[in-house]
């Protein structure tokens, strides 16, 4: 009985060590809603040390949209550190998001006669540039932090993340911004 138990333990241990001999999934591509890309972004994340998952890394992404006369573009760049083992990691990161906003210009009349014709001055305005915090024009930079959880399979494959993403700029600090992402680790 002891021999059988030792053989099973030896074979099982060999399979486990064999499964971990392959390359670690130190790179991933993912889509994120909210987070450092502000509205949404598509990202590439990699570890500087290809032999360890719980190490320093970097993330670069891009996102944007155009709806009517409004458009938005973002380019998040962050340095991050993963803490954990196996598939579960706590993430801390810090970076900047370059973004540009083009808001629609609109005009309106301040005074009308009894027939509904404009008799006052025609006012033309462009809506303010804001994304949660006021910003001083566009293009601009927004500082971002990343505090979150990542699940990365040891053999690669489907990965997901959820994070709290405080944002800041010269006009303030907003601690309650968040993001959720899904992607593929390889």
Regions found by a protein language model. Name each.
Residues 1-2, 31, 162:
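Generic cytosolic/nucleocytoplasmic N-terminal low-complexity/intrinsically disordered segments
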Residues 1-23, 182, 186:
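Bacterial Sec-dependent N-terminal signal peptides
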Residues 5-7, 14, 28, 117, ...:
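Residue-level marker of intrinsically disordered, low-complexity segments enriched
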Residues 6, 18, 30-31, 134, ...:
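A general structural-boundary detector
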Residues 7-8, 38-40, 51, 86, ...:
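A broad, structure-centric signal for solvent-exposed, well-ordered loop/edge residues
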Residues 14-16, 41, 144, 179:
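A generic alpha-helix preference that emphasizes hydrophobic side chains
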Residues 20-74:
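Short glycine/proline- and aromatic-enriched beta-strand/turn motifs that initiate or cap beta-hairpins
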Residues 53-55, 64-186:
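Outer-membrane beta-barrel transmembrane domain signature
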């Amino acid at each position: 009985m002891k021999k059988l138990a030792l053989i099973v333990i030896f074979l099982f241990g060999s399979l486990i060590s064999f499964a971990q001999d392959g390359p670690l999934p130190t790179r991933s591509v993912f889509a994120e809603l909210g987070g450092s890309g502000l509205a949404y972004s598509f990202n590439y994340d990699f570890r500087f040390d290809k032999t360890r998952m719980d190490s320093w890394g970097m993330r670069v992404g891009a996102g944007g949209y155009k709806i009517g006369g409004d458009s938005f573009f973002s380019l998040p760049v962050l340095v991050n550190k993963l803490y954990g083992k196996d598939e579960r990691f706590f993430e801390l990161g810090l970076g900047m998001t370059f973004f540009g906003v083009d808001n629609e210009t609109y005009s309106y009349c301040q005074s009308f006669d009894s027939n509904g014709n404009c008799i006052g001055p025609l006012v033309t305005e462009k809506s303010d540039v804001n994304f949660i915090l006021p910003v001083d024009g566009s293009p601009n930079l927004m500082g971002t932090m990343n505090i979150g959880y990542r699940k990365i399979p040891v053999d690669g494959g489907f990965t997901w993340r959820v994070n709290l993403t405080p944002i800041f700029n010269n006009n303030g600090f907003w601690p309650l911004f968040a993001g959720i992402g899904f992607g593929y680790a390889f």
